[in-house]
Each structure stands twice: as structure tokens, then as C-alpha cells.
Amino acid sequence: MADSEDGDHVATTTTEQRYDDDGHLVPSSGGQEEEGSGGRDVVVPGGHVAEDYRSGVGVPVGRDAGGATSSPPQPVHVTPSILVGSIHAPVFQGELVGMKFGVGSGSMGAGTSATRRLPATGFGALPTSSMAEDSADHADDDHLAEEEEEEEEEHYIDDGPLVPSSGGQEEEGSGGRHVFVPGGHDGEEDHPDDLVADLDLDLLVDGVVGPVPGGHLNADAPAFVPTTRGRQDLYSALSSSAPAAGYRYRHYITSSALAEAGHVSPFLGLPYATAFDSPLDRELVGPSSAPPPCSAASRAWLVRCSSPLSDSEWTRRSILAREAAHTPASTVTGRGRFEFVPIPGAPYAPPPSFAPIAAGAGPAARPLQQLAFGLEEHKTKLCAEYYSRGLGCPRGNTCKYAHGEDDLRLVVAVSSLADAGEGSSSSDSSFAALGGEDKYKTKLCKTFTSGGLCLFAANCRFAHGEVELGKKEPCWYFFSGQTCPRGDTCGFRHSY
């Protein structure tokens, strides 16, 4: 029926409403308003928002692009109902109640400010008692499957709901629908990263896995707390848990030994260091042959813990063990410090003195007498090889024969002087008796002063420079067969 009035007259057009066999309203042409049985004007396909004139509240409604449904609508067996988009919205007592519409990234309840994906059994259901009785028998499974296929992307925070987008604007869902989210924020979803790996300490120590920043460490044993018998208890625990050498602390690493920022690199801070006088033996501190850490971020190793106290204790025990293996037990004690047991009759002799040689002078005179008789023929004859080889002797300075007339010496047997009872209280008299001492180092060496290399070196009887002039006193180190620590700078004579 249609009433029209020109000017002051209002034209009212009433169209015929058509219902199907189940009592559902059949939509008319796209874009026009249809009056439902509840007295509400609802935008049918081609429209966007259904307004409730009584409450004045706009209800957000899902909308297919272009206003067309991808499949024939499947009726929900409730009478009456209104087809909105592709959802059948039942009407009770003249009002549209509790609709939930399927949208691109989930489902949205009417009047809410966030969307959440609903389980399949509750999709499109109405939170009313009358609807609950029929929802189990009249669920639209085909429609649910089609809606889920259209969903291509879902953004959730850690507990599932979609993060709202920018306030008041329309966001395009993956299912081809525009979603109006009141009070949301723009665009990017928050993804708090609480899904971090659980790290096992044994795997980290063995290098099987690498440390993950922020990872949760699975420590399957309590931290070690020093007690009165803590050292013995820890020693027993390690001995029973580690069958071979190279022990590793797998269950006695405290959380304080882990580095910051999630980089797990357990260094051994020994908790018992302050409770005892000395730590355990070094072989229990760490693997003796373990390689050094490759990288603090790639592999975590146990490292050797060393301190002055532990080093000294370990050294003391090592020396005691080695000494006990090679020395009688009476000479090594283990009372916490070393005790050096004096050996009876230890050889100790003072440097020999150049005392006068006399008959029956005793043991002190014998070395000097033997030295004097050994030097009886030293440098008293010319070296034949020295002249035959063109002034070159293979023995060099060690040759007992004189290499030239300047090298000749006059040696007088000491025994004859001793038998005669001659001598003086000074050491000069005994060596002066060897002959030629009045000329020793009193003149400069011609070879040395000419810039040549003297083959006699320190044994040359002539002075090599002004410093050696007047060196008449014999060097004790040289004549006793030892090396003089002063070398050529010695103020005493290094020559026979």
C-alpha cells in the first residue's frame, strides 16, 4: 500500500513482505529498507549498519564486500528472523538480541570493543535460554566451514584475543569484511614474547645447545650451601656422581654464577671458599684437559677456578706426593707444611786457601801440591804443531805447550821448596815460586794493541789493556776449575 501527498502530504510506501516456508523474511532488492516483524528497519545486503530506533544505539554489523553472499543463506530454525549479511539474526519479542557476527580475524560481540575468536560450537549462537535449547540441533556446520576458509590471517596476543586496531576506523579483515572496532589503536599488533626455550644445564655445559637470551634455566638440583661438613659432603657427592677424572659441576651451580642478559655462561664461583681454610683439590675444580670457551654466546664451559690459596695448597700436596714416592717416609711429613730434615755429613767445604806448603801440612795443602806438580811442564816447551801448521794449533788456548817464546814459562817444582821449608805467609810467594810471575801482565799484548785478535784471550800472560796491568793475584775460581763470574773484568789473574 502507498499513500502520497503533495506539499504537506507525506508519501508512505508499504511493500509486501515475503517469508519462506520456515517463516524467514525473504530479502528484497539491494539497498532498500525492509521492515521486520520486530518493528526495526534493517539494512539488507548492500547496506551496512542496522539501527535500533528505540534504543538509539548503532549495532556493528559484518558486511560482505558488495553486499552479496558467497553462498545461499542457511536458515536458523527460529521464527521470525532477519537475514543480515550472511547471518540469520533471530528476533524475539520485537527486539534483536545478542547477535555475534563472524568477522575477518575472529568474532565480535555486539557493543564490545574487542574481538575474540569463538569456538566452532559457539559461532553464531545466541546467549539466551530459548536459543540455547535449539542451538545444538540447528548449528550451521556448512556455514562455519565456509567462514573459516575465508580467514587467512589471525593476530592474537598470548591468551588468544585479537589486539584492537585504531579507534573508530574500519580495518579490513582477511575474510573480505570490514570490521569496525570502537576505541582501538592503529594497526600493529602486540606480540609479547613469552614463548622462550627452556634450557637444560647439562646441555649447555656439554655444548649441545647454545644459550638463548631470556631463556629459562632448568636446574634440577638445589644450590650447594656450605655447612660444617660441607667440604666432605661435596667431595663425596662429586666422587659418587662422576665415575672418571675431569669432574664437572652439573648440580652445584647457583644462579649467581650465571651471567646477565640471558647469556648463560656458568663460571665456578666456589661457594665454600669462605667457609673453609682451603678449597678442594684442583682436580675436582674443573676438567684438566677441557678446552677453553669458544664464545660466551655460543658455548658455555666450566673453567678452572684458581686463587693464590688454592694454588699454594695444590702445589704443597703435589710436592708431598712426589717426595713420598721417591723419599723414605721419615724425611717427608704431612702436617700442613714442609719440614726439611738435615742430612748428616752434608758436603760443605770452604773455598781453598793458598796457605804455605810445608811438610805434613795436612789435607788443605794436598790440592795445591797436586796443582803445582800438574803445572810442572805447562808452557815450558814450544808447541810443535803451532809452528808446523803456520802458527795455528788445533788445541788453541788449552794447549799445554807454549805458542811462541812469549808464552814460555819457568816452572819450579814446589816439592823442592816445601822440603827446604821456604815460603811466606802470603799466597803470592807460593805462586811466585812457579816462575816468571814478575813479568805476568806487566806488559801489553802486542797482538791486542795492534788491533788483532789474541788467541790466548784471558790466558795471555800479557795485559790486554791498561786495566789488566798489575793483575798478579791469582783468581780462586779459575785455579779451582770453576768459571769466574766476573769473566774478563775480574781483577785477578786467569792464567797459569
Curated annotation (Swiss-Prot):
A zinc finger (C3H1-type) spans 377-406, 439-467, 469-496. The keyword DNA-binding applies. One of its GO terms (molecular function) is DNA binding. It comes from the Eukaryota. Keywords: DNA-binding, Metal-binding, Repeat, Zinc, Zinc-finger. InterPro entries: ZFP36-like, Znf_CCCH, Znf_CCCH_sf. Residues 143-156 have a biased composition (Acidic residues). Residues 1-77, 108-194 are annotated as: Disordered. SUPFAM superfamilies: CCCH zinc finger. This is Putative zinc finger CCCH domain-containing protein 48.
